[in-house]
Curated annotation (Swiss-Prot):
Lineage: Bacteria, Pseudomonadati, Campylobacterota, Epsilonproteobacteria, Campylobacterales
Pfam annotation, one family: GcpE
Annotated S-S bridges: none
Catalytic reaction list: (2E)-4-hydroxy-3-methylbut-2-enyl diphosphate + oxidized [flavodoxin] + H2O + 2 H(+) = 2-C-methyl-D-erythritol 2,4-cyclic diphosphate + reduced [flavodoxin]
GO terms classed as biological process: isopentenyl diphosphate biosynthetic process, methylerythritol 4-phosphate pathway; terpenoid biosynthetic process
Organism: Helicobacter pylori (strain ATCC 700392 / 26695) (Campylobacter pylori)
HAMAP family from the UniProt entry: IspG
Residues reported to bind [4Fe-4S] cluster: 264, 267, 299, 306
NCBIfam families attached to this UniProt entry: ispG_gcpE (TIGR00612), PRK00366.1 (NF001540)
Protein name: 4-hydroxy-3-methylbut-2-en-1-yl diphosphate synthase (flavodoxin)
E.C. designation(s): 1.17.7.3
Pathway annotation from the record: Isoprenoid biosynthesis; isopentenyl diphosphate biosynthesis via DXP pathway; isopentenyl diphosphate from 1-deoxy-D-xylulose 5-phosphate: step 5/6
Gene this protein is translated from: ispG
Keyword list, A-Z: 4Fe-4S, Iron, Iron-sulfur, Isoprene biosynthesis, Metal-binding, Oxidoreductase
Cofactor(s) annotated in UniProt: [4Fe-4S] cluster
Length: 359
């Protein structure tokens, strides 16, 4: 059952609202050296085109920190500086970026955290308290180990530090590399704080592994009403992080946008190369943002049965096929004419739906 979203304190990263009633935002992280402004800008452009709302960049040295001023000028997305170990880089970054991410397990003493808070206060930019199971502060790691309890205690401790400094412009993340700890940690912390949550499974693996872990962990939390912004961490292409994240949002009922693809797993009745055709159709129609159920089937049995509730369906037969709109056959065509006709019909349906929404 889809639960109502937990209403959290709203913060802003650039012009993007996080928490409250704001849409759940997606983000990724560049892998270039941040000081290489041209390469980093190119990656941010790719993420923008893929549909990302925010971008995070690594600040590994002073050169990276100083480059943020120029990068901010050319970035099409709000910029988050990711800081580990060296709090002074955060002080430099705060002068240019839209938000700072710190890992309390390695940023240093209370005095160093205060310095970062003061810099963020001055520029009115938020902080993400980024707790990772693998790098908890010594006192929590020794007492609890890399457990949900240890992660939650770290988050509460650091939230209190910021609150005591009269700073509440922050969000929290609790990341582990597996599904169970991730879910348990967020569930445990949610009733204890009002701050927005950034969701993610850290070091989740390649496209296949990460997609499964993230769908289970983040999708489950989203359906429980937990989560305000998210990243799907994938060892691979940047665009895949956004593609998978937006798919998780759609299928967890938190994003009413884009096509819900329905296709059969194939069987002995199949009379066409359905795998290639399904890939071809999805790629050709990937630009459509209108919510539609689109079905690609390998035979008329499934098309007239399982796919009859789709907004539009295509079914392949013996060198011919059907195009079905809202349960009614509208075309019976030779196989060579099916694809282009189907694409046109889906695009026209999307335009009809968009027009009706505006009217």
């Amino acid at each position: 059952m889809l639960e109502n979203r937990v209403k959290t304190k709203q913060i802003f990263i650039g012009g993007v609202a996080i928490g409250g009633d704001a849409p759940i935002s997606t983000q990724s992280m560049t892998f270039s050296k941040t000081a290489d402004i041209e390469s980093t800008k190119n990656q941010i452009d790719r993420l923008k085109l893929a549909g990302a709302d925010l971008v995070r960049v690594a600040v590994s040295n002073e050169k990276d920190a100083l480059a943020l001023k120029e990068l901010k000028k050319v970035s099409p997305l709000p910029l988050i500086a990711d800081i580990h170990f060296h709090y002074k880089f955060a002080l430099i970054a705060a002068q240019s970026v839209d938000a700072i991410r710190i890992n309390p397990g390695n940023i240093g003493s209370k005095e160093k955290i205060k310095a970062v808070v003061d810099a963020c206060k001055e520029k009115n930019i938020p902080i993400r308290i980024g707790v990772n199971a693998g790098s908890l502060e010594k006192q929590f790691d020794q007492k609890y180990g890399p457990t949900p309890k240890g992660m939650v205690e770290s988050a509460l401790y650091n939230a209190k530090l910021l609150e005591d400094l009269d700073f509440t412009n922050f969000k929290i993340s609790l990341k582990a590399s597996d599904v169970i700890r991730t879910i348990e940690a967020y569930r445990m912390l949610r009733p204890l704080v009002i701050y927005p949550f950034h969701l993610g499974v850290t070091e989740a693996g390649n496209l296949f592994s990460s997609s499964i872990k993230s769908a289970m962990a983040l999708g489950g939390l989203l359906m429980e009403g937990i989560g305000d912004t998210m990243r799907v961490s994938i060892t691979g292409e940047l665009e895949n992080e956004i593609k998978v994240a937006r798919a998780i949002l759609r299928h967890s009922g938190r994003l009413k946008e884009g096509i819900n693809w329905i296709s059969c797993p194939t069987c002995g009745r199949i009379e066409a190369n359905l795998v290639d055709m399904a890939i071809k159709v999805e790629k050709r129609l990937s630009h459509i943002k209108t919510p539609l159920d689109i079905s690609v089937m390998g035979c008329v049995v499934n098309a007239l049965g399982e796919a009859k509730h789709a907004d539009m369906a295509i079914a392949f037969g013996n060198r011919s096929g059907l195009i079905i709109k809202e349960g009614k056959v509208i075309h019976k065509l030779a196989e060579k004419d099916l694809f282009e006709t189907f694409v046109i019909e889906v695009e026209n349906l999307a335009k009809e739906r968009e027009k009706s929404l505006k009217d």
